[in-house]
Each structure stands twice: as structure tokens, then as C-alpha cells.
Design a protein with these regions (language model features):
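Ribosome-associated RNA-binding proteins
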Residues: 1-178
Length: 178
């Protein structure tokens, strides 16, 4: 029988609803489904407990994954996650804006049709000149939004040494630069 216990900081609360774990803190709340056969996730007092009766490699790997997810959720609701992106163009000036729940890029390589990337979850997008800052409590939502914005400006079948226009991730959580 394996058991992992993750302590909750004072400003964080957690609760389970069947297979969904919700963690709330000063930066917001994050809900995630944590389900795997023979693995239970429970909130006991001021800790999140992950238990299993099975000892096979796949179950142990899943328990480690669940532990990382819970730690990321706790970090997200206490400090948040932040990505920085850089807008780069050489000839056609791009206009990047936020409209409703999407990031809109206009005049990319002189195109007339705007390109749109959805904003995932509770991600907050701030545009300041040539820099875009994405922040939020959910690491996956913020990272997915940043990745979709970067992929939106990808130029297929062209030499990337020549066609350098785009929006690029320059700083990620846990890494100094990308």
C-alpha cells in the first residue's frame, strides 16, 4: 500500500467531489479530475492524501503524476503562473488585441483576415506594446493559451530564418527563458 500526503498552506483550502479535486486560494481556484483505478484522492484535515493498494509500476507512476498535479494546483492558487511572450515583425506591423475570450492578431504578414486564439480557463492576458503577459492559477490553461498563440503565427513551409514574424514565448514558469 502506497500513500502520498501533500500539506496545504494556511491560505489554501481543498475539497473533493467524487473524482474532482478543487483547490482554492488567494489567486483563485482550480478544479481537476484525478481518477485512476485503485487510486483514491482525499482531503484529510490540512492535507491532500493520495492512496493505493496496488503496487504495480503504472499505478506508482500515476500517483507521482497526481502528486505533481496537486502541487501545481497549490502553487497556482497561491502564487499563480505567468508566461511572457514577445511580438516580433519585420515588414508588416501586427496588431494584437484581446476581444471577448480570444486573442486576435491582425495584419500578420499582410493578411486581411484576423487570426484568433481562444483564451483558456481563467487566464488573464495583458498586452503592453510588444510584450504579452499571460497569468492565471491553472498552469495547463495558461500554458495552452500561450502555445496556441505561438502556433497561430507559425508560418508553414517557409524558411524560419527568413520569415521570423510571429509571437514567441520568451519566459515560462520554472524556466528563466524559453
Amino acid at each position: 500500500m502506497s500513500r502520498i500526503e501533500i500539506q496545504l498552506p494556511e491560505s489554501v483550502s481543498a475539497e473533493t467531489d467524487r473524482f474532482d479535486l478543487t483547490v482554492e486560494g488567494p489567486e483563485g481556484s482550480v478544479t481537476r479530475r484525478l481518477w485512476f483505478p485503485n487510486v483514491t484522492v482525499e482531503v484529510t484535515g490540512e492535507a491532500v492524501t493520495i492512496e493505493t493498494d496496488s503496487e504495480d509500476a503504472k499505478t506508482n507512476a500515476t500517483m507521482g503524476t497526481f502528486e505533481s498535479h496537486v502541487e501545481n494546483m497549490i502553487h497556482g492558487v497561491t502564487e499563480g503562473f505567468e508566461y511572457r511572450m514577445q511580438i516580433h515583425y519585420s515588414h508588416f506591423p501586427m496588431q494584437v488585441s484581446v476581444e471577448d475570450d480570444a486573442v486576435v492578431i491582425q495584419n500578420f504578414l499582410g493578411e486581411t483576415a484576423p487570426r484568433r486564439a481562444p483564451i483558456r480557463g481563467e487566464t488573464d492576458v495583458q498586452i503592453d506594446g510588444e510584450e504579452i503577459t499571460l497569468s492565471g492559477p491553472d498552469k495547463e490553461a495558461v500554458g495552452q493559451t500561450a502555445g496556441e498563440i505561438e502556433q497561430l503565427t507559425r508560418v508553414p513551409d517557409k524558411d524560419t530564418r527568413v520569415f521570423q514574424d510571429g509571437v514567441y514565448i520568451v519566459e515560462k514558469p520554472g524556466r528563466g527563458g524559453a
